[in-house]
Amino acid sequence: MARSKTAQPKHSLRKIAVVVATAVSGMSVYAQAAVEPKEDTITVTAAPAPQESAWGPAATIAARQSATGTKTDTPIQKVPQSISVVTAEEMALHQPKSVKEALSYTPGVSVGTRGASNTYDHLIIRGFAAEGQSQNNYLNGLKLQGNFYNDAVIDPYMLERAEIMRGPVSVLYGKSSPGGLLNMVSKRPTTEPLKEVQFKAGTDSLFQTGFDFSDSLDDDGVYSYRLTGLARSANAQQKGSEEQRYAIAPAFTWRPDDKTNFTFLSYFQNEPETGYYGWLPKEGTVEPLPNGKRLPTDFNEGAKNNTYSRNEKMVGYSFDHEFNDTFTVRQNLRFAENKTSQNSVYGYGVCSDPANAYSKQCAALAPADKGHYLARKYVVDDEKLQNFSVDTQLQSKFATGDIDHTLLTGVDFMRMRNDINAWFGYDDSVPLLNLYNPVNTDFDFNAKDPANSGPYRILNKQKQTGVYVQDQAQWDKVLVTLGGRYDWADQESLNRVAGTTDKRDDKQFTWRGGVNYLFDNGVTPYFSYSESFEPSSQVGKDGNIFAPSKGKQYEVGVKYVPEDRPIVVTGAVYNLTKTNNLMADPEGSFFSVEGGEIRARGVEIEAKAALSASVNVVGSYTYTDAEYTTDTTYKGNTPAQVPKHMASLWADYTFFDGPLSGLTLGTGGRYTGSSYGDPANSFKVGSYTVVDALVRYDLARVGMAGSNVALHVNNLFDREYVASCFNTYGCFWGAERQVVATATFRF
């Protein structure tokens, strides 16, 4: 029996009513019992199920609430921007190894930026990636601030939901990529007992075991805990690379009454090996080598002793207190420490590639051999990043006449420090690799020849303070959302080798305005304007860090979220522009200059529906028309890794009657259109379609309620494809067929 969160005398009657209602209807409902003394009967009236929370689980694949777009618990149809939510229920259907894999059926999101590699969750949203190598990913509303190679990742098994907000978001979050962000919500303690153990085995010698335990620590539900963890070991797709991950997430909630909630959240993850993180040339992948052959999809151009490890530690809390019907205060806080270490040899294109024009090894080859010898470089890198973030909000609900307001005021602060101790090998620092007869050997990463390599020791510091205000004002069926934010963003880079320091302090105001019209039938058209800014970490030829880029977006859309059915259908048309993009110096120096512009226009459609207890459907379509509208070199071109068309469709069916009762069958397809492989648009990466499948059996039929066994297959027909390229020397094979058997037991 579920334990109540607070001790109230009337709960005993409610518990009796639940038992009676369950016996009568065969399904659990929340109920209230009324006993009339004149009659020897009990009248049971079913009450609505508890309302979904933006910070908690959703009952189906179609989540109806989100806090990512407003920082308040808001119905999705009331947010004047596009939001997609991948619930734990949907993740359970696919059992993804990474969060980016969990987003494979989400519109507007390119997840193939690194092909089969699971080292990072790098995404391109509406044609834009985060500045540099960093991700634009958040956990519980606070940014997982990364720097250089030091980006944190969260395992999807630890999450309640993963949400994509598309378009500029600086009005709430400060510095950000104009394309949007990923916000993940951690699993939190429950007052109902949860005991889950999971086992996985599959392709590439995958073995994983996980556990998820939660319960109240007292009869009144004041104290509760959750402990989630996993251990995973697998071979990466590329020969010689491995993936190892050990993670645990202890959480504890103190809820003294129904108006106060304090939840301690933590996450500890150790990855002795993060897998493959190299790249391959277009020759042998997109195009055949001179001998007419292509490289195998498990090809690894690195050294045999390549290593790449990461360690993450995060502790923090989420606190909220409702003073009365008007005022609620919330605060999210987290301290994180991330360490990465790598010794990596990586490819840098065949010798005939202009990128290797200064290589002496390549110059010594006969012209006929330059097309099948791969130039390589290396990096030795150790980093330690510390990040502190806190976001404090005051929510005020009140009315002015006929207008209901939800006013949010807040201030957030972020401080990041990343100490980089690296050594880079340049041209000719690693022997060439014959792609006709490749022999991977160990590499001496300690040699560090100053003739062709050098140190890179940098201490990067960043700070951001932002104050913001947002009003969600509703008059009858009209909802107006208006918000503004002012940021102070400071960055400092100390070059320990040269003994120089680069600094830049930026101040920026951004705002968003939107209007929604809420029809009674669940249809909600909307219009919005939003802005973003994103500081640069690069330095110009004058020695100064560049000014931030800025984003502006106009979006028109419609959402359909009926009150009585778990269906969410959204569609949007947008025009998004990024100004002050960096571009090549027209005077021919090796430095970039400011003043570039990229524009993206697009259409996105998404549908998520639990059409019945048996049928789930997820579908999406994306059209993205991205272009360098101002650039000294690439004007009129399309950015690399941005397909014009993407589409996906998934459906699953569960049998509840007959001999197949308890069986779930599912299948889906993901289409990615062709994309350009470099900013010069000198070649294209072909389109591809992959098919996924699911077979799952509910063990309740054999007396094990809540448990199941399943077989998940991604890329069912083992389609060979190049996921994307960012340049002529940087292409990525897509994931091969993955077959994973899963056994989940609840007791």
From Swiss-Prot:
It comes from the Bacteria. Binding of ferrichrome or colicin M enhances the interaction between FhuA and TonB. TonB activates FhuA through interaction with the beta-barrel. Residues 34-192, 216-222, 256-259, 322-326, 397-404, 474-477, 518-522, 561-565, 611-613, 655-661, 699-705, 747 are periplasmic. GO terms for biological process: intracellular iron ion homeostasis; siderophore transmembrane transport; siderophore-dependent iron import into cell. Keywords: Cell outer membrane, Disulfide bond, Ion transport, Iron, Iron transport, Membrane, Receptor, Signal, TonB box, Transmembrane, Transmembrane beta strand, Transport. The record marks 566 as: Interaction with phage T5 RBP-pb5. Induction: Induced 1.6-fold by hydroxyurea. Disulfide bonds join 351-362, 725-731. A motif (TonB box) lies at residues 40-47. This is Ferrichrome outer membrane transporter/phage receptor. It comes from Escherichia coli (strain K12). The gene is fhuA.
